[in-house]
């Protein structure tokens, strides 16, 4: 689905990387507008994988290490690097970055990213690099007794819970985007789609499903749609990270990222 957006192929409505969307808006190459429906959220404390038999267990140990990122501009990576600065005083400049050769967008020159032909996950397993930054690994699909990798933090859930308790931030990764041609043909589509997604989520909850990241029973909706105060704060945080990591030249106006009128839309 992302490929259609990135390659300029025809589409009407799509789920897309929020970081890449903001980057494209900054460069004036976005042929779409977003609506405040955020379909993917995840904490990123568990997104760095190291060798299971290694001694790395805290961000303070990562200065000067070599870390692989398959896609350097991926939203997950943007969140992780920002989190490391805010929470652990680990700057992305303090890391030696390597990536796959094919990238959605060229990494900032200041990051000094070296593109490699090799499989980055295998390089960690072989001890050639120190860690890989990724939402998940192929190694994690294997039986636990033969897995070679583990998350950096010994207790990822505890780190996530502490962060959420202090900040209230449940990181946004993807948003729904609508192609400009579709917007021109169907001006009512954005609000209709927003209402449909809200109704779908309400039905999901009514059937007893749980969208809490840790599986806790709660009456709170941790994935609200719309430009709520908290969602605005989270988008601002992501924009700040993009700016600090030199992906975008300016901090955009949040409302300008979304179709007109969304400030009044309510997720009920």
Task: Annotate each PLM feature.
Residues 1-4, 57, 93-126, 217, ...:
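Short helix-initiation/N-cap motifs at beta->coil->alpha
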Residues 1-93, 97-100, 104:
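Short, glycine-/small- and polar/acidic-enriched structural segments
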Residues 11, 129, 247-248:
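Conserved hydrophobic residue
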Residues 29-31, 147-153, 264-268:
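Short low-complexity, flexible loop/linker segments enriched in glycine and/or proline
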Residues 64-65, 171-175, 222:
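Short, solvent-exposed beta-strand edge segments and adjacent coil->beta transition regions
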Residues 108-205:
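Pocket-lining segment of extracytoplasmic ligand-binding domains
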Residues 172, 247-268:
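Conserved C-terminal helix/tail region of periplasmic/extracytoplasmic solute-binding proteins
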Residues 177, 182-247:
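Secondary-structure end/capping motifs
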């Amino acid at each position: 689905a992302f490929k259609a957006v990135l390659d300029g192929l025809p589409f009407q409505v799509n789920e897309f990387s929020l970081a890449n969307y903001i980057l494209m808006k900054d460069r004036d190459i976005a042929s779409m507008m977003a609506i405040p429906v955020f379909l993917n959220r995840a904490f990123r404390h568990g997104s760095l994988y190291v060798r299971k038999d290694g001694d790395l267990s805290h961000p303070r140990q990562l200065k000067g290490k070599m870390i692989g990122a398959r896609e350097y501009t991926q939203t997950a990576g943007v969140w992780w690097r920002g989190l490391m600065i805010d929470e652990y005083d680990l700057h992305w400049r303090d890391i030696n970055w390597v990536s796959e050769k094919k990238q959605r967008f060229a990494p900032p020159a200041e990051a000094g990213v070296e593109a490699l032909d090799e499989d980055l996950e295998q390089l960690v397993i072989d001890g050639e690099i120190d860690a890989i930054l990724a939402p998940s690994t192929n190694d994690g699909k294997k039986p636990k007794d033969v897995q070679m990798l583990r998350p950096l933090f010994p207790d990822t859930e505890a780190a996530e819970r502490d962060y959420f308790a202090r900040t209230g931030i449940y990181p946004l990764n993807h948003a729904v985007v609508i192609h400009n041609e579709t917007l021109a043909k169907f001006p009512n589509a954005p609000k209709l789609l927003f209402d449909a997604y809200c109704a779908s989520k309400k039905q999901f909850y009514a059937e007893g499903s749980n969208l809490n990241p840790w599986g806790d029973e709660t009456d709170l909706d941790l994935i609200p749609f719309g430009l709520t105060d908290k969602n605005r704060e989270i988008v601002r945080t992501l924009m700040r990270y993009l700016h600090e990591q030199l992906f975008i030249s300016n901090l955009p106006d949040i409302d300008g990222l979304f179709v007109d009128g969304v400030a009044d839309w309510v997720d009920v």
